[in-house]
Amino acid sequence: MVMEMSKTYQYRKVMKPLLERKRRARINKCLDDLKDLMVECLQQEGEHVTRLEKADILELTVDHMRKLKQRGGLSLQGVVAGVGSPPTSTSTAHVESFRSGYVHAADQITQVLLQTQQTDEIGRKIMKFLSTRLIELQTQLLQQQQQQQQHQQQQIPQSSGRLAFPLLGGYGPAAAAAAISYSSFLTSKDELIDVTSVDGNALSETASVSSQESGASEPVWRPW
């Protein structure tokens, strides 16, 4: 028993310094990587730092993360509310990126539903939800672009005659009207509406015709 305790004690006595050195090496490596990242970020902001202590690295990192958190909060607030301060090009780009990803995901869901043997009530509800949310995103993006355009017009001289920066997207009322037609959901698989992704920054809007009867037809939105 004494021999076993002695071996355990000796093992801990030897391993503890080794583990401590490994832990310190990991900390130092992370601090070095963090220093390189912070120096690069500061240089992008116009600040030049030649030497940083470990405490300085941690302080700068905390400040930088707080700034990122505030910016992210403002962007999220603009996405959710869609009102308040004029949206920046960054927040508008975030909304556009999310909308494009949503359209792509909705297209994949549509393809799966179209491949099913029959269209049930659940499928129609899913398609209705997707189209309603897509129209909301489209309206939200248009509102933010209008606010951004008004804000830019106030910031530049009236004699310039054009905006300093082009707006993202390029969507107009016609696209919103085309999106609204997407909410007209019917009762058969052939009448389910396909949502496709956007090509570039513009949403192509076209109307296609589908019918259950030989003489009946109604427009649906197929943006490809």
UniProtKB/Swiss-Prot annotation:
Domain bHLH: 11-68
Key words, A-Z: Coiled coil, Developmental protein, Differentiation, DNA-binding, Neurogenesis, Notch signaling pathway, Nucleus, Transcription, Transcription regulation
Molecular-function GO term, any one: protein dimerization activity
Positions of region (Disordered): 205-224
A biological process from GO: nervous system development
Chief location bin: nucleus
Residue ranges annotated for the Orange domain, each copy included: 98-130
Pfam families, per database record: HLH
Gene3D superfamilies: Helix-loop-helix DNA-binding domain (4.10.280.10)
InterPro entries: bHLH_dom (IPR011598), HES_HEY (IPR050370), HLH_DNA-bd_sf (IPR036638), Orange_dom (IPR003650)
Domain of life: Eukaryota
Compositionally biased region (Polar residues): 205-215
This protein's record includes keyword Coiled coil: yes
PROSITE patterns: BHLH (PS50888), ORANGE (PS51054)
Chain ranges for the short sequence motif WRPW motif as given in the UniProt record: 221-224
One GO cellular component term: nucleus
Function comment: Transcriptional repressor of genes that require a bHLH protein for their transcription. May serve as a transcriptional regulator of the Achaete-scute complex (AS-C) genes. Belongs to notch signaling pathway and depends on Su(H) for transcriptional activation.
Domain characteristics, as noted in the entry: Has a particular type of basic domain (presence of a helix-interrupting proline) that binds to the N-box (CACNAG), rather than the canonical E-box (CANNTG).
Protein name stated in the entry: Enhancer of split m3 protein
Organism: Drosophila melanogaster (Fruit fly)
